[in-house]
């Protein structure tokens, strides 16, 4: 399987018309780094990002740097979200009822606070243009048991535990480089032996919130090295030619 990361960007589950030069190559190289860094935690689908290892068609210059040769997997229909800091839709929910995705959190937290422990908040994996739905861990078990009656709970527990372990390892490393990983999303699949394997992209600005450690101050929103700028611009410019009336604007997960 060949996975190609394009220079396009999406927001609110819609692909925008503008492109960002070399975005696909940067995201591919970031995923490559993190896949190699975490291969001792969970196996992943990456085989190679070298053009010489690709089928002839993908050896073309336009695919150089932004393509990954991967093991083909049966993907699990759960997006594995982990939050180490309270922000975005999690902060909005906490202000309303003191919970994030049904998980009760300590009183007195302020926006961008670090959580006592990372929390796992899975969601459904919607089709493009539809919206993912936050679900409880037990609901994720139900979803997987419908597909894998004898293994659903085992798979749900594994992807939860892998998600937390991956986040802790990577967040600790990122801090040494001056970066806070506020939250991120992982996806998993099954190989031919029925083993859980990490797939898709990993810890890119498309799937994560990255904040600079320098200047981090709880109690307010943080500058970010991700596509939050795009989301903010879209919400601030409802009269732009992106036809935002057709896009359901809500806080990102």
Regions of interest found by a model, annotated:
Residues 245-253:
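Residue-level detector of conserved catalytic or cofactor/ligand-binding positions
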Residues 196-241:
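A translation/RNA-centric and nucleic-acid-associated enzymatic feature enriched
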Residues 1-112:
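Conserved ATP-binding subdomain of kinase catalytic cores across diverse folds
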Residues 4-14, 112-151, 234-245:
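Residues forming anionic-ligand binding surfaces in small-molecule and nucleic-acid pockets
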């Amino acid at each position: 399987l060949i996975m190609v990361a394009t220079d396009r960007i999406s927001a609110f589950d819609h692909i925008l018309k503008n492109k960002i030069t070399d975005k696909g190559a940067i995201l591919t190289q970031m995923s490559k780094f993190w896949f190699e860094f975490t291969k001792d935690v969970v196996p992943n689908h990456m085989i190679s990002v070298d053009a010489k290892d690709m089928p002839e068609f993908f050896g073309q210059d336009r695919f150089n740097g932004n393509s990954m040769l991967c093991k083909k997997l049966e993907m699990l229909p759960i997006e594995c979200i982990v939050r180490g800091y309270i922000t975005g839709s999690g902060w909005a929910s906490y202000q309303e009822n003191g919970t994030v995705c049904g998980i009760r959190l300590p009183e007195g937290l302020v926006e961008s606070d670090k959580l006592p422990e990372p929390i796992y908040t899975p969601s459904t994996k919607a089709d493009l243009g539809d919206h993912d739905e936050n679900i409880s861990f037990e609901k994720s078990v139900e979803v997987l048991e419908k597909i894998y009656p004898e293994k659903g709970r085992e798979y749900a527990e594994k992807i939860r535990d892998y998600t937390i372990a991956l986040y802790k390892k990577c967040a600790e490393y990122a801090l040494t480089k001056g970066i806070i990983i506020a939250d991120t999303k992982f996806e998993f699949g099954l190989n031919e032996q029925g083993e859980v394997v990490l797939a898709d992209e990993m810890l890119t600005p498309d799937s994560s919130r990255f904040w600079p450690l320098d200047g981090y101050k709880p109690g307010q929103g943080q500058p970010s090295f991700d596509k939050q700028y795009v989301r903010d611009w879209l919400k601030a410019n409802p009269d732009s030619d992106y036809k935002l009336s057709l896009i359901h604007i809500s806080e990102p997960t």
